[in-house]
């Protein structure tokens, strides 16, 4: 049986399948995804195979979108449990608004020509991400993806720059 490997230059993708498929992350046990279900995945350093990409929509979500989204939620993130590295970085649930998802996925793959287009894409992707808010592990996974992107040394450099500005 043939399967497709999904590649993204962004840290996060959300898939929406219009028919039943399975997804395998890093060669582990395949996870079945029913029609009209969404899967949120961390792509960075992970090998993601899906049984079929026909009738599958993919939204690509950048570091900046994740960062802006966490800021937008305005939650105390210090209380969020740390994502377990050994866990498969995937969350799945039914999609309630496939039409919105379709537009979000299209926008996420097109370079934004204007500022308003950029804002529209951001709002659409926030809507897609917000569907996962009820999932207990969602914020842990988002923060894990963000931490993965910004290495500690970068954080320290940013912090020391801030101190320089103030002193």
Predicted region positions:
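Short amphipathic alpha-helical segments and their helix-coil junctions
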Residues: 101-113
């Amino acid at each position: 049986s043939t399967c497709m490997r999904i590649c993204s230059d962004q840290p996060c993708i959300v898939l929406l399948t219009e028919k039943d498929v399975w997804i395998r992350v890093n060669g582990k046990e395949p996870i079945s995804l029913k029609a009209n279900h969404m899967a949120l995945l961390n792509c960075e350093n992970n090998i993601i195979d899906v049984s079929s990409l026909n009738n599958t929509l993919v939204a690509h979500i950048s570091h900046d979108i994740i960062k802006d989204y966490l800021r937008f939620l305005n939650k105390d993130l210090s209380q969020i449990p740390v994502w377990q590295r050994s866990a498969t970085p995937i969350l799945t649930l039914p999609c309630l608004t496939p039409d919105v998802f379709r537009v979000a996925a299209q926008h996420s793959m097109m370079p934004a020509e204007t500022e308003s287009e950029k804002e529209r894409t951001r709002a659409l992707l926030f809507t897609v991400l917000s569907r996962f808010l009820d999932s207990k592990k969602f914020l842990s996974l988002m923060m894990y993806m963000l931490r993965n992107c910004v290495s500690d040394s970068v954080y320290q450099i940013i912090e020391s720059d801030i101190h320089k500005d103030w002193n």
